Amino acid sequence: MSASYWDSSQRHKWKYTRESLAKEKQKLWLLECQLFPQGLNVTIHDSKANKQVTTNIPVTQRDLHYDRDYNLRIYCYFLIMKLGRRLNIRQCALVTAHVYLSRFLLRASVREVNLYLLITTCIYLACKVEECPQHIRTLVNEARSLWPEFIPPDVTKVTEFEFYLIEELQSYLIVHHPYRSLEQIEKALSSEKYNYKLSDDELQKIWSLINDSYTTDVHLLYSPHVIAISCLFAVSCIIHKPEDSTKRANINMFIAETQVNLEQVMFILQELISLYDHWDKYNELRIRALLHELYLRQQTPAIQ
């Protein structure tokens, strides 16, 4: 266990470059194409003919590939939040669960595991690691109340999956988040040198951006403080009007003196912009229907 990000397994074992991350994704993509060449047959409602039509979605399309399907990524984000809020689980544990999910799905396909059971297990493990453990039966009961078709009543299924999850994570379970960096940034900005106090509205918006960033790959690529600074810069640009030149100047001076890599900051901002662009097109009915067909192999709700 490491109290410092700089000495942590997160930095030394689970931090990728953009090139190495792309290679990992490509390896999984090729494996999926080999294992599931038949694609997925789904029932689609043809509005013109006003009837149900069965069609095949080739495995080479982006659907159900976690690295390419933003619909799936956003849906996973909502699944974690929904179960977490039912049990009043701390935000830190929920985002740790999301990091576990991202790491796991870098090495395993959604097509070969039960996504709903995976998410339940990620939350169960994250709560133990973040020292806010949940009773396994309570967690499984809540998960079953949300997704009864996909979560088995046998709690040992979660404990079995937990061993599989830990193995894929190589037992590196400590995750450092940008929230602590944000606290340090807030304290530094309020010092006499910068004389800038972040408002409650600014802090809330930065927190929201950090929360949403877990839907992207930035936590596999960059240090927590870089993500926190990127979200600070984004909120500063949104909130402060051109006439607030002093406030912008103080924040820009702070960012410059941190010597953070501005290319990384720009990439994180681009990832967030791309995420929100896809969020506007989010189609929950479609992804739910695809997963229903994938896991249950029976009549599915029509995809609108």
UniProtKB/Swiss-Prot annotation:
- Give the GO molecular function terms: cyclin-dependent protein serine/threonine kinase regulator activity
Q: Pfam families from the xrefs? A: Cyclin_N
Tell me what organism the protein belongs to.
Kluyveromyces lactis (strain ATCC 8585 / CBS 2359 / DSM 70799 / NBRC 1267 / NRRL Y-1140 / WM37) (Yeast)
Q: Name one GO biological process term.
A: regulation of transcription by RNA polymerase II
Which lineage do the record's taxonomy fields give for this organism? Eukaryota, Fungi, Dikarya, Ascomycota, Saccharomycotina
Q: Where in the cell is it found?
A: Nucleus
Q: Keywords for this entry?
A: Activator, Cyclin, Nucleus, Repressor, Transcription, Transcription regulation
What GO cellular component entries does it have? nucleus
Q: What's the superkingdom here?
A: Eukaryota
Protein's recorded name? RNA polymerase II holoenzyme cyclin-like subunit
Describe the subunit structure.
Answer: Component of the SRB8-11 complex, a regulatory module of the Mediator complex.
From the UniProt record, report the name of the gene that encodes this protein.
Answer: SSN8
Family from the record: Belongs to the cyclin family. Cyclin C subfamily.
Question: PANTHER family attached here?
Answer: CYCLIN
Q: Which residues form the Cyclin N-terminal domain?
A: 43-174
What task does this protein carry out? Answer: Component of the SRB8-11 complex. The SRB8-11 complex is a regulatory module of the Mediator complex which is itself involved in regulation of basal and activated RNA polymerase II-dependent transcription. The SRB8-11 complex may be involved in the transcriptional repression of a subset of genes regulated by Mediator. It may inhibit the association of the Mediator complex with RNA polymerase II to form the holoenzyme complex. The SRB8-11 complex phosphorylates the C-terminal domain (CTD) of the largest subunit of RNA polymerase II.
